[in-house]
């Protein structure tokens, strides 16, 4: 296994065992003594595959042994295997008949970055967001019981995902219904416990064995006849285990806890899983793994190698020269946050486990006492911000659009109803590319504009983003600024912290007959099309409050209004324009351009925009078609 870039051979080595393990059926024909070699081959395969396509990397390297052991011991797909989030599922895809398709990973019309039910019968539950696996597996376990089936449901969840409240809701529920399921905690950060080594591995084999389980149940029946005897025995067992393993919390919830064991020790994994396969009721196995296992750079820098673009410099094609572009929108936000924090001591920054992605690293270093990473807990993040706002703080919640959906009730009930000063910096708005529909920010304008008192802004470039962040920070009430992934058009950024006038759009180009009303970063494409057809272009800037006076004026002087947004057309910014026109009894032809009523599948962002008709060519074609229909 290569441990550095320089050790990556130009020619892919042979993988005789992996060639036989095309599916779990072939895997189960291998002898146990061959599985260590298979693990080496699978790691190498993952290195080459992700090096070619890009994608999530470190997590998959860390679960090679676990993936092999699960498909070796359990009768998948009849036994239901649910991967939480899905970042670690590439080895699973390779072993379940998709090895030859891995070269299309995350590409248009290729296989998805996450498990998808439509892609394989081995993908029992579609994922992308975190902390859903235990609830899903619990539902599957209860359904199996109702159907008279003894199939097992297994959830694999990481220690990071276990921080979300939803995971604990399921952990609390499963023992109440005595679900026949197994939860595997993949502890790759050692945030819950340290690996206690061989003694813990040995203890896990004993405690998971059928002999121990039978003795335990037999003792329970005998001692239950003696007043207090079983309770004393239970506590003695708990204290003895507690001296070696950290499972008290899970035991108290009603789970049979085993571990922690070494997640890279295949013989121990297989023996323990075989034992636990035959146990009834809710079972909990705690394994400790190393993210990036087997590739030194990823082991040293697990955050940097969580996801990669191109890894193999020897085999990758030469990169095309990049077009000149401005800074990343997230970088503009991060710089503004530091500047405003220096000017306003009331500002605090909150993120649900997205410090690097949302560009809060500099803020966390400069203002550590005002920085709060609440982990994967979006609901808590929003209400935590609401509580701080009640006491005079000015919280800024930096969150991806797709994850704000998870805290929507808190946004409405805890922030908006109380009209609290919370600013939501909504990153990754619109189409995000290769991660596909689970990560797209397709709906935020629709679900935000219906909230009374909410200020909703859509910058068209980096400078407007900075201005709107200041506007939202100074606004009395809840505010949201949504901006896309990637780089801006290289606009000149004014470094002051002055707000802009709320609810006012700007006419960027004056034309005739046709007018573009643009909400967001498609302004540049609209301006290019407008030059060809002599159209007016308006940078609307505010979805709520809508600049109704400007819309009325533009409607009065043009025959066709074209709204443009990178959000679902249904209920979006364009819908706000049509609602206003209808309310004012203004009859005007309106063309809405935005995201269609489908989930846009993974591809390059440019390909996705073209598919939705939101690139220059698509916008021009749609507008010309409507103009022809209207004889303009």
From Swiss-Prot:
Alphabetic keyword roster: Isoprene biosynthesis, Magnesium, Metal-binding, Thiamine biosynthesis, Thiamine pyrophosphate, Transferase
SMART domains associated with the record: Transket_pyr (SM00861)
Pfam family, one: Transketolase_C
Record-listed thiamine diphosphate binding positions: 87, 128-130, 160-161, 188, 295, 378
Obligatory cofactor(s): Mg(2+); thiamine diphosphate
Recorded GO MF terms: 1-deoxy-D-xylulose-5-phosphate synthase activity; magnesium ion binding; thiamine pyrophosphate binding
Recorded metabolic or biological pathway in which this protein acts: Metabolic intermediate biosynthesis; 1-deoxy-D-xylulose 5-phosphate biosynthesis; 1-deoxy-D-xylulose 5-phosphate from D-glyceraldehyde 3-phosphate and pyruvate: step 1/1
Keyword match DNA-binding: no
The protein's name in its UniProt record: 1-deoxy-D-xylulose-5-phosphate synthase
Gene behind this protein: dxs
